[in-house]
Amino acid sequence: MAWNGRFGEDGEEERSLELSLALPGYFSSSGLQGNTSTAADGAKGNDGFKASRPAAPVVGWPPVRSFRRNLASSSSSSKPPRGGRDAAAAATGGKVARFVKVNMDGVPIGRKVDLAAHGGYGELSAAVDRLFRGLLAAQRDPTMATAAAAAAAGESCTGEEEAIAGLLDGGSGEYTLVYEDDEGDQMLVGDVPWNMFIAAARRLRVLRSSDLNASTIRAGSRKRAAAE
């Protein structure tokens, strides 16, 4: 069979057909450049995503409700200003009131006395005497109610309104003034220095000397020796 010389032409046509079946612009320079730029952009995007810092945690999370914020602000505004005690002390001449309860045997009514308002045991004894002198007389004689009112008002008393003797005599008089300290012990008034007494006294009581316990006197003597 003779070759007609068209084989080459058919081969060329088939080759051109195969080339034409490829994707448009696959072998073109513009396509290569486009693919290269797309890959570069993707790489940049990946690098940028990896290089980005993690988001910082949200401060104040979980969120506080409004009514809690209002409650916190109101509580902070209601706090008393510092130095209130110092201001009160300055207003009263540098002394802060130190009130304690005072009770007396035979008198159902208690009183209060300001320890800081007195400068020593003598003044305290006189103040307790004024508080209970008339009340004690009224307990003994109901006709002395007027005298009791006068004594409560701090007025001077005469006649049968005698002073309560022996408050600071350590049990030698009819009545003895004792106090309860911060440890709950009953102590004789006058056994320790005045400043220590003011800091430790929580309650005063006027007891009959006959009702005093010997342990109270011994405990007072021990604390007085320790203070000295």
Swiss-Prot record:
Keywords: Auxin signaling pathway, Nucleus, Repressor, Transcription, Transcription regulation. One of its GO terms (cellular component) is nucleus. Residues 97-214 form the PB1 domain. Its main location: nucleus. It comes from the Eukaryota. Aux/IAA proteins are short-lived transcriptional factors that function as repressors of early auxin response genes at low auxin concentrations. Homodimers and heterodimers. This is Auxin-responsive protein IAA16. It comes from Oryza sativa subsp. japonica.
